[in-house]
């Protein structure tokens, strides 16, 4: 929108993200033609977009996610961090399917990363499973935000 003064629909944006989106440089820059509406004239417009442009757009949110992964590791017990280092990190959710997310996190954490077999469904299934155990969880079992606040305060 900002770079090309062009408006595209959510479906088109999702298609571009899935097709050529990346957070780590691809071996070859991918290009996709996008159709939308010119914000200056209101007329239809076509524009070629590259994976390098998308990587630049995703840089800040990707960095924030990696920083959160590092923060969780820092706040976790040594035993848990050792288990994660031994077994690796499994990425879930739609965003992890962006090209290179596993490489980026692995590079920053120095821990091997893999993408779950069905990353889109894993988050929902995991939430459902956690509800089955909610009554048996102890207070603070997964309260990392509280630990972070205590550490900063």
Regions from the PLM with identified roles:
Residues 1, 111-115, 142, 149-152:
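Short beta-alpha connecting loops at secondary-structure transitions
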Residues 57-85, 130-133:
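Phosphate/ATP-binding catalytic cores across multiple sugar-kinase/actin-like superfamilies
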Residues 1-59:
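Phosphate-binding glycine-rich/basic clefts of nucleotide- and phosphate-handling proteins
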Residues 33, 90, 114-115:
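Structured core elements
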Residues 103-129, 133, 137:
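Conserved phosphate-binding/catalytic loops in two-lobed NTP-binding clefts
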Residues 16, 69, 91, 127:
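Residue-level signature of catalytic and energy-coupling elements of molecular machines
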Residues 21, 25, 81-105:
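Glycine-rich phosphate-binding loops at beta-strand->alpha-helix junctions
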Residues 9, 13, 28, 129, ...:
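Acidic, glycine/GT-rich loop-and beta-edge segments that sit at the periphery of enzyme/chaperone cores
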